[in-house]
């Protein structure tokens, strides 16, 4: 049986982000590889909600090599540091390299999450939250999904806060800066059920 995992903002090879992540220790990328390899099985699905690297061509190639060596089926929701994102003119050129590693790549996706009382609800996946950023300015607004009431799993903010009732209680941050780990579907399902129950 396969499991489903979520994460965001890996930033493989990104020295500034690694420095800010004191929890990851001196070898950030090795620490993330160990976390991944200990939990993810060959048939598991890992949704990466953007920013595999710092965005330069060499950094992207290194991050793709890092991902290629990790178990599981990787699905990438493109972020602002991922060059295949349509915000970049050279997106088609680098997309081919990404497809060698990924089995899905898009700017957004929708998943069904089971509800405790039966049935399911739809959640959206995007790198960008409905609202929030790690700067004072709300950047990349033209690439953000419009909030029409669906729960949103996101990254981008580099916040340690998983769910904020002050910004939008229907968005869940699955980034490494909040979790320090991959997020299993069971955790997401629990939070989604809490939101649907008004908690």
UniProtKB/Swiss-Prot annotation:
GO terms for molecular function: cyclic-nucleotide phosphodiesterase activity; phosphoric diester hydrolase activity. InterPro entries: Calcineurin-like_PHP_ApaH (IPR004843), Metallo-depent_PP-like (IPR029052). Disulfide bonds: none annotated. It comes from the Viruses. This is Gene 66 protein. It comes from Mycobacterium phage D29 (Mycobacteriophage D29). The gene is 66.
């Amino acid at each position: 049986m396969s499991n489903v995992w979520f994460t965001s903002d890996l930033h493989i090879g990104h020295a500034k982000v690694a420095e800010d992540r004191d929890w990851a220790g001196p070898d950030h990328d090795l620490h993330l590889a160990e976390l991944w390899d200990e939990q993810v099985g060959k048939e598991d699905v890992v949704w990466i909600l953007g920013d595999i690297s710092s965005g330069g061509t060499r950094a992207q190639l290194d991050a793709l090599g890092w991902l290629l060596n990790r178990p599981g089926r990787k699905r990438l929701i493109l972020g602002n540091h991922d060059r295949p994102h349509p915000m970049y003119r050279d997106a088609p050129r680098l997309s081919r390299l990404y497809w060698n590693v990924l089995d899905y790549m898009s700017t957004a996706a929708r998943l069904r999450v089971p509800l405790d009382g039966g049935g399911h609800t739809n959640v959206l996946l995007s790198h960008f939250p409905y609202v929030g950023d790690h700067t004072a300015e709300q950047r990349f607004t033209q690439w953000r999904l419009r909030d029409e009431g669906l729960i949103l799993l996101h990254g981008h903010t580099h916040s340690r806060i998983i769910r904020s009732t002050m910004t939008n209680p229907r968005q869940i941050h699955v980034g490494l800066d909040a979790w320090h780990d991959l997020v299993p579907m069971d955790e997401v399902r629990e939070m989604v059920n809490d939101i649907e129950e008004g908690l």
